[in-house]
From Swiss-Prot:
The lineage of its organism: Bacteria, Pseudomonadati, Aquificota, Aquificia, Aquificales. CDD domains: Ribosomal_L16_L10e. Binds 23S rRNA and is also seen to make contacts with the A and possibly P site tRNAs. The keyword Transmembrane does not apply. Keywords: Ribonucleoprotein, Ribosomal protein, RNA-binding, rRNA-binding, tRNA-binding. This is Large ribosomal subunit protein uL16. Belongs to the universal ribosomal protein uL16 family. One of its GO terms (biological process) is translation. Part of the 50S ribosomal subunit. It holds the Pfam family Ribosomal_L16.
Length: 141
């Protein structure tokens, strides 16, 4: 199973940062007919993105175009089990995409609305945040 991750990066570990504010970039449907939009802030892991992508592709018919609009480029670290505090920051465990409210995470096109709603229902179960289905032009469904 190949997960999304950066091919190269300048620093191995990053600071956690905050999840304040909303998304000012990537908040409109740009490529497809429908989009899945985040309503909350959260870190979305590379595993969650892949699980959502598989659920989306399997619930749509062949010939449907799918775009993934988020990329996990932030490394997150974790200390091993049963290790006391201190001793420095843990080793990188994986990568996450920082998602803020308003961000379009997935887009797809060439599909009827009822099939789009069913695909949305399956994808939303794979994500740790509240999401909504939006149509191109900014209309919520």
């Amino acid at each position: 199973m190949s997960f999304l991750q950066p091919s190269r990066q300048k620093y191995r570990k990053t600071q956690r940062g905050t999840l304040k504010g909303k998304s000012f970039r990537g908040n409109q449907v740009a490529f497809g007919e429908y989009g899945i939009q985040a309503l909350e802030s959260h870190w979305i892991t590379q595993r969650q993105i892949e699980a959502s992508r598989i659920a989306l592709v399997r619930s749509l018919r062949k010939g449907t175009k799918v775009w993934i609009r988020i990329f996990p480029d932030k490394p997150y670290t974790k200390k091993p089990a049963e290790v006391r505090g201190g001793g420095g920051k843990g080793d990188p465990e994986g990568y996450v995409a920082v998602v803020k409210p308003g961000r379009i995470m997935f887009e797809f096109s060439d599909v009827p609305q009822d099939m789009a709603e069913e695909a949305f229902r399956k994808v939303s179960a794979k994500l740790p945040i509240k999401v909504r289905l939006v149509k191109a032009g900014g209309m919520s469904i």
